[in-house]
């Protein structure tokens, strides 16, 4: 039987529409704040409030799904995101936007956990990899479409918010025609997340997820601001962001194949080294588009390879707790990255964005170059 059943396809359709909305706002929110002459550190704090919401949403998602089920929790999360989006029209104020983006971050994290969990519950041991691969491709595709739309439609606040809100409401419709059961055949006691974070064999993978969060959080939150300060229009910024994310889509398959064939450790070393090269190329004012392309190829594929490394020695019963620990690690990184980087950019120079990215990547590369604990196999079953 095909892994892509009717409910799965409907769920992925809803995710695509929702992700387009996320991508549009993640790019335009920093630009709107910049146009209002807010200082860089405040723009970074608004980005960080979104990632703080991601962290809170990750922590409450399990109980939320348990209480409401997949379908109702999905619809409630969409409504929360739509309300947080419409709230941006009330006033362009630092404190109010801090709150609205926090709520939007909670809604996004809930949607991610709901969709991932529903896909895992729908799949089997033989097709879960296909389902999660489709999930990542849909997510990145929605991100690219959202960036490309910025070159077609008006980017004014009062023009964007109504159709983005309508798109989120439309994303609720597919799950009206699909039902996902959240009851398991036999309940087992939940496994704590904290022991997963302390597991020695998973340390490099967990650190990789943190670094990935710092990298992607900074790029999503501050690269639009960096490009805007370079004199680019909103449409040009959207095009550069689309290039960045598209390179991540292109890099997914070859990086996964390399990791399967040559081992996670070697691929992680290559990815981190390429991130450093891309950052240095941008700082050296070399061709921006090729530099962003190689940065996206390496940076956007770092998280799944690090996640596979961390899950390598986790038993089947521990996978949910380990995945939760990894998502928390990523979220903490994506929270810390824009906060620290925006303060440095405000104090010194916009170039600190790529200096910070190259710096944290170099630290992780030093960890990877140390001899790791012996592994029975360099490959991980995904």
Curated annotation (Swiss-Prot):
Regions that span the bilayer: 8-28, 41-61, 73-93, 94-114, 133-153, 157-177, 208-228, 274-294, 325-345, 349-369
Family statement: Belongs to the major facilitator superfamily. YcaD (TC 2.A.1.26) family.
State whether keyword Transport applies.
yes
Question: What are the GO MF terms of this UniProt record?
Answer: transmembrane transporter activity
The record's subcellular location field reads: Cell inner membrane
PANTHER family from the UniProt entry: TRANSPORTER MFS SUPERFAMILY (PTHR23521:SF2)
Q: Which GO terms describe its cellular component?
A: plasma membrane
State the UniProt keywords alphabetically: Cell inner membrane, Cell membrane, Membrane, Transmembrane, Transmembrane helix, Transport
**Name of protein:** Uncharacterized MFS-type transporter YPK_2680
Cross-referenced Gene3D superfamilies: MFS general substrate transporter like domains (1.20.1250.20)
Which Pfam families has this protein been placed in?
MFS_1
> InterPro entries in the record, alphabetically?
MFS, MFS_dom, MFS_trans_sf, MFS_YcaD, MFS_YcaD-like
- Membrane topology summary: Multi-pass membrane protein
Record HAMAP family? MFS_YcaD
């Amino acid at each position: 039987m095909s892994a892509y059943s009717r409910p799965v396809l409907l769920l992925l359709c809803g995710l695509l529409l929702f992700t387009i909305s996320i991508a549009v706002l993640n790019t335009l929110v920093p630009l709107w704040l910049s146009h209002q002459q807010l200082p860089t550190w405040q723009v970074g704090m608004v980005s960080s409030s979104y990632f703080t919401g991601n962290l809170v949403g990750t922590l409450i998602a399990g109980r939320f799904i348990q209480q409401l089920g997949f379908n109702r929790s999905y619809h409630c999360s969409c409504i929360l995101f739509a309300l947080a989006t419409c709230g941006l029209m009330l006033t362009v104020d630092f404190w109010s936007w801090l709150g609205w983006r926090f709520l939007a971050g909670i809604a996004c994290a809930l949607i991610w956990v709901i969709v991932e969990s529903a896909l895992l519950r729908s799949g089997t041991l033989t097709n879960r990899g296909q389902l999660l691969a489709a999930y990542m491709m849909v997510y990145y595709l929605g991100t690219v479409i959202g960036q490309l739309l910025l070159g077609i439609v008006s980017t004014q606040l009062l023009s964007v918010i109504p159709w983005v809100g309508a798109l989120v409401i439309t994303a609720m419709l597919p799950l009206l025609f699909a039902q996902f059961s959240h009851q398991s055949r036999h309940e087992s006691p939940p496994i704590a997340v904290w022991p997963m974070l302390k597991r020695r064999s998973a340390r490099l993978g967990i650190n990789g997820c943190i670094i990935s969060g710092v990298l992607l959080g900074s790029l999503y939150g501050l690269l639009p601001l960096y490009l805007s300060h370079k004199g680019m229009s909103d449409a040009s910024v959207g095009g550069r962001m689309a290039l960045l994310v598209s390179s991540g889509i292109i890099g997914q398959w070859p990086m996964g194949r390399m990791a399967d064939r040559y081992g996670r450790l070697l691929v992680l070393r290559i990815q981190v080294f390429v991130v450093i090269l891309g950052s240095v190329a941008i700082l050296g004012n070399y061709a921006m588009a090729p530099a962003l392309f190689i940065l996206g190829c390496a940076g956007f594929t770092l998280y799944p390879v690090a996640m596979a490394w961390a899950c390598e020695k986790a038993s089947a019963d521990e996978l949910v707790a380990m995945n939760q620990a990894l998502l928390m690690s990523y979220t903490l990184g994506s929270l810390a990255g824009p906060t620290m980087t925006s303060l440095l950019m405000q104090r010194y120079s916009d170039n600190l964005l790529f200096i910070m990215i190259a710096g944290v990547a170099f630290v992780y590369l030093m960890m990877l170059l140390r001899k790791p604990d012996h592994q029975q196999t360099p490959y991980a079953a995904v």
